[in-house]
Amino acid sequence: MRNLLLIGLFLIPTLASAQRNNGKGMIYLDENRRPVLRENIMIPAVNGFEVLKCDFHTHTVFSDGHVWPNVRNQEAWQEGLDALAITDHIEYTPHKEDVNVAHNRGYALLVESAKMSNILLVKGSEITRNTPPGHFNAIFTGDASGYTEDRSGEQDRSAVMKAAAQNAFIFWNHHGWQPGIEGSYEWIDLVEDLYKSKALHGIEVINGFGIHLKALDWCIDKGLTVMASSDMHNLVAHEYDRSKDYVHRTMTLVMAEDRTPEAIREALDAGRTVAWASKYLAGKEEHVRALFGACVHLLPSHYTEVKANGNKTNWYEIRNNSDLYFELELKEGNGTRHVVLYPRAAQLISAPAGTTSLTYDVTSTYVRSDTHLSVVLPLK
């Protein structure tokens, strides 16, 4: 009872400070408001590069999204993103009877608020062709008012080339989203033509809640940049279960020289990216390996357990110094078989004394459609 009374006494000044009374019969319940704060996504530098959190595929009411552009900026700030692109559809604008659709307008409305929020705003559009070939995102674009709205197949190439003529970074979107249409998930002639013409620079390997594994192989085999995006139309909070610590919108991790649009573009051109979707990472092996190595550290053995039969087991602490999530399955050696590294957390693993290393597959990663990152943990 004493503890309850103490708690009650402590609450009295808290409630008094949360409520504002203007002395004229009005009480403001400020304690019921959502706190104004920005998440801080912790990912250490990788090989000297900053890891920037970027979403280059989102929508607003200026195409088929459900929100005004400023909401996208607010969400990006709250969720700890570094860079954002509004990529409203060029050829598909179902709200045009209610909204004065202009292809540059969503970006224009955000320029000042993004600067104030310290969000790097990248200009972009979604070139929305029929499937196949499907949709292409163009970012780092110029004036989009002259982009092609005609969706006929004869205009497919020219629609993309208008963005290419502006030196845009172009990536192919969500290939498996219409599996019932023949050619929707194939490397078709038009895509080969764009690729050879250097008008295709990346592929969206993860779109929202779907991983397109064949697209990862294409990126690796053809030297294209691995991309991941939310493709958000609704509110992020309506789509993602943010009650789980590891859940967040799908995004591209960009390993950039600094936090500027120019550095992001250079990194995209160089292919220094990893796709991130809550528990899962996908990318070229060199980048996924470097990211894992920057985040995960195995400490020297801190304890040797001596069994009744005289056998000795060494214990180690393995730490995850990031907000990423890793699952490991033992492949070679005699030691702890399954390890889950939660964000900013550590686990204990063990191995018989004398064991020099353990080899794990990081099953929460993909470096090809059928391959997880393999890591060797040296034991000291």
What positions do the PLM features span?
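Positively charged n-region of N-terminal signal peptides that target proteins for export
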Residues: 1-5
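Hydrophobic h-region of N-terminal signal peptides that target proteins for export
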Residues: 8-17
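Alpha-helical transmembrane segments and their juxtamembrane interfaces
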Residues: 12-13, 67, 98, 241
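Charged catalytic cores and adjacent phosphate/nucleic-acid-binding surfaces used
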Residues: 19-54, 73, 133-141, 183-380
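A metal-dependent hydrolase metal-coordination microenvironment
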Residues: 28, 33-173, 179, 205, ...
